């Protein structure tokens, strides 16, 4: 998977290995080189040997939870702690269009042609150079422009128990294909 920091600057990555028929999967017992497809979508980026763009997750056994298991976990641990947990084929996460109080910012839209980003210097840049704030309107909605890149806050605040891990699915075919999973950011708020 792309690292969250890679996804937040809209760089799409996919792992490739010899003999595999799928991206981002390495079969058990594999020995050989790994290759990485790197596709910057919004910002031009500088990459060097050793730049960390992807993360590998090792899994063993069943890796998904059923809805009943998620409901039990939410009942016992409180996964969603600021509202109702919408569990149906996984935990649904929705966009927060209420803003954060004073300024009503609901997210950020990437600026095109804002300049190079050196992926080895993540704290070097000001937010305002690369991002425009997105505000909600009087009807509590926003209009998303096709082909643009946005980072929007979720309505739900979640807590993942230490005994579990969470991962966003790449898309839900019932609502469309969105890259919701590749810039996931959990904060401690």
What are the residue ranges of the model-derived segments?
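DUTPase catalytic domain/fold
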Residues: 1-189
